[in-house]
Amino acid sequence: MKNVTFITTGQPTTNPRLVKEAETLHKLGCKVIVICCFYQQWAQKTDEALTQRYPGMYIYCGGDPVEQKAIYIKTRIRQKLSSLLFKYTRHFGIPESAISRTHTEALAIAKKIKTDLYIAHNLGALPAAVLSAQYTGAKVGYDAEDMHSGQFTSTHDESYRLNKYIEEKYFGQVNYFTAASPLIAEYYQRDYDYLKPIVVNNVFPKAALNIGPNYKANEPLKLFWFSQTIGPERGLEDVIKAMAAVKGNIIQLHLLGSCNEGHKAALLNLAAALNLNPDQLWFHEPISADEIFNFASQFDIGMATETGVPLNRDICLTNKIFTYIQCGLAMIASDTQAQTLFMEQYPGTGKLYQKNNLQSLTDCISFYLQNPDALYQTRLQNYQLGQTELNWETETHKFLNLVENL
């Protein structure tokens, strides 16, 4: 497999899973093209570093709000109109333009590329990959980092119907299917029995870190959580409440991600109402995937606070979990289906708490406060697990076997 074209509906920085695959193939001598588009303003700067490192690899389409505003507005209007028209028709490319702002532009570019394989990362990119493959005769791969039809609480939601329609129309035309968690693979196979998903965990390349005993008596215990966006219904309010419930100890919560001022104020107000000190809640601006390991390693415990709603949040394994482990942090995780299954497989990685049970979460935090030696040993064991098993160097073989055997 010499030529591989990736298609995504976001930016490279917002899809580190795609970047890992693209860089792996590039290093093996493949000609790699990534068709992408604007998604988040904060990712622009880190995208620039990536595109400079790999000149010509990343092709942007569909404009952006600053330099190509007219094209950007046009594509947004088209997507909104298509979303409205989807209620009435499934013809004329309406569903494809509704699921992706840049479907038309990505398809036009992809059809002109001489490639052996198109790989779609996320559901919105799949129609362009399949239709391009029909035109060029190439193969198609699909990566399910999420279960897209599981992102809704009601099957009557029009967005659910759109996602389900795209899945039903295009899944049968892929040559391989990867999933980011065992349960995403299981649920998709349950819905589409012709699929044979291969699980490729959301791990990262190994990093050499010095894991010291960060937490010491009479010093703050540092909790860490990160995501592209710091928003509501992510379990963070429960962490703040649990911090307040632990009396007589100083605990800090560090949040990394893009956060609007309204939600930032809401979290700060909650902390203040619970009599937490101002220096117990920290906000950090987004950074590139290359920087996150060194940044995260200064903390003690990684928080995996999925609420389990909707279904996708119950069955996904985010890159948080693997980042925490590979950085040598202990982990406190909510008992979603996926995280419970993971903790059963790797029980030494941390503590599992019951969702919507504040005392359960408080007890987990208190355990590490009272047992700094156990915390340090867990951190050392997690770092070693990341060096020996849960890393991209190990996981990449699954991906390469799929690509090479098409």
PLM features: residue spans?
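Carbohydrate-associated surface elements
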Residues: 183, 202-203
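Conserved acidic donor-binding segment of nucleotide-sugar-dependent glycosyltransferases
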Residues: 345, 350-358, 367-373
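Glycosyltransferase donor-sugar binding loop
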Residues: 39-41, 252-268
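Nucleotide-sugar-dependent
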Residues: 16, 230-234, 288-295, 302-322, ...
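A charged, aromatic-enriched C-terminal amphipathic alpha-helix characteristic of glycosyltransferases
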Residues: 370-403
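Conserved donor-binding/catalytic core segment of Leloir-type glycosyltransferases
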Residues: 5, 216-243, 253-254
